[in-house]
Structure formats: C-alpha cells, structure tokens
Amino acid sequence: MSSVLRPALSLIVLMSLITGVAYPLVVTGVAQVAFPAQANGSLLYDEAGKVRGSALIAQSFTGDEWFQSRPSAGAFATVASGASNFAPSNPALATRVTEDAAKLANAAQGPVPLALLTTSGSGLDPHLSPEAIAWQAGRVAAARQLPLDKLQALIDASTQRPLIGPPVVNVLTLNMSLNQLPSAPRNAQL
C-alpha cells in the first residue's frame, strides 16, 4: 500500500509547489519586469501623484463639466460587476433605458447614442465610441466655457485606434485631460 501511496502523495506535494507557488511567482516576476504598469492594474495618476483610477475600469462621473461613462449594472463596483441580464422584453430594462434617455436628452441635440443607454457585458467598460463622446461635447464645452473646436481637438487626441475593432475613447483619461486645461473650473475635481 505504501508503495502506491508514497509516490502519489509526493506527486501531489510536488505539483502543488510547482503550480501553486513556483509558477505564480515566475509569472508575477516576469510581468513586473516586462509590463510593470499593466501588472499593477494600469493605474492612472494625477499631477500630484494621487491615484485617480484604472484605465481598465469605468467610473461614474456626475456634473455637466465631465464626460459621462456608459451606465453600469453594478453601480461601478468591481465586486458586483456584470450585466443586468435583463431580457430585451423585460419591462425593467425598458424603464431604465427610457429614464436614462430622458435625463440625457436635455444635455445635447439629436438621439442619445446607444452606448450611453446600454451597459457593457462587465458593467465596467471604460471606453465609449468617439461619436458618443462627441454627442456630450456641447454640454461639457458649455459647462467649462471652452470653445467646441478646442474640446474636439482634445477628444481627437484621446481617441485610441486599436489594431482590431473600432476607435474608442477612455472616459477617465479624457476627463483627466480636461483638468489639465487652463480653463478647468476650480470646483471640478475627479
């Protein structure tokens, strides 16, 4: 019996050490050397060195002086991330979308972009399309007393063009860029 049990237990201990200790330490070490910013959460810092968020996780922005992210089914909490899972036929989804559209309709002209009314699969997608950002530009320009062409130039500079997929704008980095402008309102804090 011990001739079978001993090698089996030895293998369990060895594989536990390899897969539970050695492999994670090697991967963490390689990540810290090769991709330190990404390995530490893609954190974004303001000019004072204070962490303002992650480039990978959306945040809620309120106030006309900010570009707003798409809605979150989990109130932008990473622990409760995920979609609402409401079926298209669910009245609760229709009610939420109608209420959100009514709130946003006063902010700009034209129909509200779909990305500002629907949650992403994770509920934490930090990106919006340049069109959804441009739709909000008039409201932000008026609140910050900025010329619209200056704001559009900032949007263009913040637009990311991935190798695969459509162009996107990270809402947090765009809002952080707004605070770098000389006309940033004194009360506008992220």
Swiss-Prot record:
One of its GO terms (molecular function) is P-type potassium transmembrane transporter activity. Pfam families: KdpC. One of its GO terms (cellular component) is plasma membrane. Keywords: ATP-binding, Cell inner membrane, Cell membrane, Ion transport, Membrane, Nucleotide-binding, Potassium, Potassium transport, Transmembrane, Transmembrane helix, Transport. Its main location: membrane. Disulfide bonds: none annotated. The chain crosses the membrane at residues 11-31. Part of the high-affinity ATP-driven potassium transport (or Kdp) system, which catalyzes the hydrolysis of ATP coupled with the electrogenic transport of potassium into the cytoplasm. This subunit acts as a catalytic chaperone that increases the ATP-binding affinity of the ATP-hydrolyzing subunit KdpB by the formation of a transient KdpB/KdpC/ATP ternary complex. HAMAP family: KdpC (MF_00276). This is Potassium-transporting ATPase KdpC subunit. It comes from Pseudomonas syringae pv. tomato (strain ATCC BAA-871 / DC3000).
